[in-house]
């Protein structure tokens, strides 16, 4: 599996201020991790990819899951993109 590189949320928010909401920025960074090369993720791997604590990533994921932006596969223990993104993708 290839390596995926993301600028960490911590680095990104270190000196630049966009006036945005940090939690939203972090949640969107998580969603951006999912692609054809990485269609599913476990919490520890996502935490490393975005350079955030596992507890923070877990809370963000639970919020995204509650709104169907992410879905959990209990058999695999992995998250994938959820059904709420489908209508948005086809606009």
Residue ranges of predicted features:
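N-terminal helix-turn-helix
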Residues: 2-91
């Amino acid at each position: 599996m290839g390596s995926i590189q993301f600028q960490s949320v911590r680095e990104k928010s270190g000196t630049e201020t966009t006036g945005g909401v940090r939690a939203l920025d972090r949640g969107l960074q998580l969603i951006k991790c999912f692609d054809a090369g990485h269609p599913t993720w476990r919490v520890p791997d996502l935490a490393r990819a975005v350079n955030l604590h596992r507890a923070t990533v877990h809370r963000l994921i639970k919020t995204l899951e509650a709104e169907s932006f992410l879905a959990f596969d209990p058999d695999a223990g992995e998250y994938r993109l959820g059904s709420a993104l489908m209508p948005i993708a086809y606009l």
